[in-house]
């Protein structure tokens, strides 16, 4: 395949980062060209987003939605709107797992994901959801090759 098809994958693990919730101060990109004037790890993510064409949300399900750590980062996407900054992201996907057997427990996170994709104008490449995951690392028992996703 030509080099144009080679991809670099960067993992940004919000669970191990310090990202404060958005304060809606509307001072985005006003200081040192940083996405958020409150200097936390979101600025690192914003820099990565400014160079990415795809974003994949990979997260456990917490109470029918995104966990706080990734939700804080998603809320700060607001900075790109206020700062009138375009990101080259064109496509997105959701990967999630949850403890309960009922597949409907994913309805909330899937709908939130769909609305994010619609709002940002990203092509929704779908979702891959795994229920009945009861222990740390349990998701990997169900994982298929990325060709299947």
Predicted regions located by residue number:
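N-terminal beta1-alpha1-beta2 submodule of the flavodoxin-like/Rossmannoid cofactor-binding fold
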Residues: 2-80, 118, 124, 137-149
């Amino acid at each position: 395949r030509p080099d144009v098809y080679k991809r670099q994958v960067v993992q940004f693990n919000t669970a191990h980062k310090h990202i404060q919730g958005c304060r809606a101060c509307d001072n985005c990109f006003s200081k040192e060209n940083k996405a958020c004037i409150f200097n936390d790890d979101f600025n690192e993510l914003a820099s990565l987003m400014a160079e990415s064409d795809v974003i994949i949300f990979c997260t456990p399900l917490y109470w029918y939605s995104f966990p706080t750590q990734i939700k804080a980062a998603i809320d700060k996407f607001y900075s790109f709107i206020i700062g009138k900054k375009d990101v080259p992201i064109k496509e997105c996907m959701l990967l999630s797992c949850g403890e309960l057997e009922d597949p409907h427990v994913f309805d909330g996170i899937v709908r939130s994901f769909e609305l994010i994709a619609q709002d940002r104008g990203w092509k929704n490449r779908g979702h891959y959801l795994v229920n009945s995951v009861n222990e740390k690392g349990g998701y990997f028992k169900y994982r298929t090759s990325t060709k299947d996703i």
